[in-house]
């Protein structure tokens, strides 16, 4: 990742959308629309949103057999699938604030972690200004 990459991305048109709480499928559909818009030359997008009801979002390739469907039904937890990879993420109605950052792939570093760090740096800076000690996890996952 270079400073040129960060500078070029900062000079592009961006929009910030603060969404209301919505159900999981709608939040994922809005992320997909934002991605398609950026890919078609539209603005890059930062969305901040909440989930209603509480939702378990599955990674794109995650096996649905890993879900405790009975528990989700008993607790009123919706289940949806993200367009991105990784494992399941629980989004609580009362305690979860989510965000998505969308920009064309060609404008980002080729390495996934470099892109992640580039896009997350402003978030860490904002937490720092709020007095919150936030950083990347340095220990490998079990």
Language-model region placement:
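Active-site loop/lid in soluble adenylation, ligation, and acyl-transfer enzymes
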Residues: 2-74, 81-82, 106
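Short secondary-structure junctions
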Residues: 16, 79, 134-136
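Short Gly/Ser/Thr- and Asp/Glu-enriched loop/turn motifs at secondary-structure junctions
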Residues: 51-53, 94, 137-140
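Short, conserved acidic/polar surface loops in the N-terminal third of protein domains
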Residues: 68-71, 90-95, 110-111
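Residues forming anionic-ligand binding surfaces in small-molecule and nucleic-acid pockets
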Residues: 83-106
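Catalytic beta-strand/loop module used to bind and position nucleotide/cofactor moieties
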Residues: 105-142
């Amino acid at each position: 990742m270079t400073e040129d990459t960060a500078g070029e991305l900062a000079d592009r048109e961006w929009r910030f959308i603060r969404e209301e709480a919505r159900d999981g499928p709608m939040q994922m559909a809005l992320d997909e629309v934002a991605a398609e818009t950026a890919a078609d030359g539209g603005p890059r997008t930062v969305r901040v949103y909440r989930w209603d009801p509480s939702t378990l979002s599955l990674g794109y390739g995650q096996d649905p057999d890993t879900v405790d469907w009975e528990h989700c039904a008993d607790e009123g937890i919706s289940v949806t699938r993200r367009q991105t990879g990784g494992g399941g993420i629980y989004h609580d109605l009362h305690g979860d604030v989510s965000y998505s950052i969308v920009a064309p792939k060609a404008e980002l570093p080729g390495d996934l972690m470099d892109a992640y760090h580039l896009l997350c740096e402003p978030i860490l800076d904002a937490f720092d200004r709020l007095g919150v000690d936030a950083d990347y996890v340095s220990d490998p996952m079990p």
